[in-house]
Every structure is written in structure tokens, then in C-alpha cells.
Amino acid sequence: MSESSQPQAPSYRYEHELNVIDDNYRNYYQVFVYSFCDSNGDGIGDLAGVTSGLDYIQDMGFNGIWLSPIMPSDSYHKYSVKDYYAIDEQYGTMEDFEKLAAECEKRGIKLLIDLVMNHSSNEHEWFKHASKSLRSNPCGAAKDKPCLNDNICPVHDKYIDYYYFTDEKPVGTNSWYRIGSNRWYQAVFSEQMPELNLDNSAVRSEFEKIADFWLEKGAGGFRLDAVKEYFSGNPEKNIEVLNQFMKHCKTVDPKCYVVGEVWESFTNYTKYYSSGIDSVFGFTMAQESGKIAKTINGKGADNSVKSFAQAMVTVEQKLASYSDTAIDAPFIGNHDTNRGAGILGYNETKIKAAAGLLLTMSGSPFVYYGDEIGLSGSGRDENKRAPMIWDSEGTGLTYGPPDMERQENRFAD
């Protein structure tokens, strides 16, 4: 795609003045930036493309946006962060982000950014510094004395405690990878994404400073990735981390909104509301196995409209038992799940009915980009993050993720 042949996304004129209630109950639109809208003809979505689509997003009635990770990363999905204080050059510049944030504020749109606290990239300076120290010999000074080698030392380097390192690979696990000749580090999601040690107060302080930075830049809050993996199998510790982070964010900006991803059962994910977090994604309603799709597909008394109404009441009662400020965050699908159109059999009536159920629920519903036009995508993750279709001319069209299989979009004109 050449820049000359790739025009800007269409300009949707939004002509209605809205009296937006300034609270944290919003209708959110999730944007996977890489695939959303290309503004410069390189085939990759970018922040300027998101800005060009604000009229379209607002015209649908959304007053909140969740951006997938936008920080520098070697991966297309950007969940392996190399620098928490910058914008990935594929997506533009910090000036582009500030412009997007300013446009959102002008329109009364709350802008959330994805914050990955569970792990970083192995190319992050913290990990690179720690790795270099672990490959070095001790400087010879005692731990309570100044380092004689500029903190490049296995005894004095503070960044070693930012991650999980061990001398012997734990038995019965495949989430540990070798570094050097005799050390191992933990990386649950992939070798390139080492786990951060959130039991270390210094790491928590780092993320408080990171939150401060982005709130100052114009973000209205955060979507927290992989919360249940902060301490896998230890929800109490996860909740404790969230509680500290929430107290900090609300002190800095009382209007800050935070939603967490806790991919668990209803009983388990609702417990996280005791942390003081604003919202936790409602997986009980999501995907093919969720209450919305089952109700629309209508099989059995347990999936009747009456049963759905009872489920909504149950959700609100459960949330209220943990927090009087809890806001439900229901959704049908996101970048990790099969597209809504597919789980509803590509039936236009069912797709619209499912959206109707979602948007009548209490709380802050989240809609994945492209679901409003019936985009398809299932199987491997890349397929679920396919290019947004703007028009028949290919305006703003991206290439989509590497290794994405061809998608048949049945509702595209």
C-alpha cells in the first residue's frame, strides 16, 4: 500500500450534542490498534487512524475507548513491553497520543490504555540490566556496601529482584527459560515475556509512576492485563496488588477508571471487586458458552429470557456484596475470543439481538471493534484481530497481523 493510494479513514460527521454524565458508567469500544485504521499507507493501524475514526465511534454511541497496548514492543500485539514511557513507532508518536487524548476529552470520551504489569519484554532495560549482571562476576563488595562495578553485579543489581530468577529449573513446569549457563527465569506466556515480581515494592512503585505518567498524558484509566497471573493460583495476593494500585490511582485522579482481566468463573472473578477496582470483565456473559449467546441461541429453559434477567440480578447482587462502587463490565468477545458473529451463526437477527442484550445490561459494556459490522474471526489469535473494514475502496485498511488466515466477512459490502 502506498501513501498516495491510501486515503484517510472516512470523516463521519457527528451532528448531535450529547449531555454526557461525567461518571465511570460508559459504553466502551475496544480498538486493536494494529488492525483498526492505517493513516499513512504502511498497512499498519496507528494512533492517527484511531483519531480519524472518532466521529464514527462516537456516532455509534460510544463514550469510552479501550486501546490495546501502544507501547514499544517487538510483537505485533504489543503485550511484550520494552518501554512503559513511550509509543511504539509503528503506531506513531507521543504527540499523536496526546492529540488523540485531547480529541477524546473534547468529545467526552474516556480513553483507556492497556497496562501490562504481569510481565515485560525480555528486551526491556530492567531485564537486560539484570541479565547482564547475572552473567557477570560479583564485584567483591559486600551487599550492604556500594558496588564496585557500577551495579553490573549479581550482588548489587536491584533489577534482578524485578523478576523471578533461580539457579535450578523447577521440576514439572515448562515456564522457565535458561539465561546464561546456570540461571533460569520464569515466563508463563512466552520466552520473550518474563514475569515481573510484583511482590517487590520497587516494582509496584514503578507501575505507580507509570500510571502517573499516562494519566498526565491524558489517559482516563487503564485496562489491566492478566490480573490473575500476577501470582498464579493466589487470588488473595492479586487482590492485594490491585488494592494498592487502585488507592494510588484514585489519589492521583479520583475519576480514573480501571478494569481488570480476570479470566475465571463468575464466583472467582467477582472476588476481585473487593480490591476496590472499578470493574472486572464479566466472562460469565461472554463467548459461545456465555449467557448472552446461550440466550440468543435459545436452547432449554436455562437459556430463556427469564433466565437471562435472573442472571443480571445475580450479577448485580454479587458485585454489590463486594463493593458499593462496583461497575459490571459485560462483553461478548474481545481480541482473545472467537468473534461474536461466528458464535451466533452469522445470523444477522441474532447478532443484533445479542448486542441489544449486552447494551441493556447495567454497568459499562465493552464492544470489540468490527463486531458492529459482523467481522469474522476464530481459531488462532491472529484471526480474531483481523483488519477493520471501512468501505469497499479499502480506505484505512490494514494488512492485519502476520500469520492471519484469510477471513470471510459475510456482511461487508
Predicted regions: what they are:
Residues L215, G220, A226, G260-V262, ...:
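Aromatic- and acid-rich polysaccharide-binding/catalytic face
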Residues K128-F189, K291-A320, R385-D413:
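Core domains of carbohydrate- and sulfate-ester-processing enzymes
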Residues Q192, A226-F231, S323-Y346:
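Active-site clefts of carbohydrate-active enzymes
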Residues N24, V252, Y257, E264, ...:
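Loop/helix patches that line or flank the sugar-binding groove of alpha-linked glycan CAZymes
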Residues M1-E3, P7-L198, A202-S205, E216, ...:
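Acidic/aromatic-lined carbohydrate-recognition and catalytic surfaces
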Residues Y12-H16, F207-I210, T267-N268, F308-L319:
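Alpha-helical scaffolding within the catalytic cores
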Residues A101-C104, L319-Y322, L357-M361:
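A short acidic-Thr-Gly-centered motif at the start of a beta-strand
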Residues Q58, L215-E216, L319-D324:
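Acidic (Asp/Glu)-rich catalytic clusters
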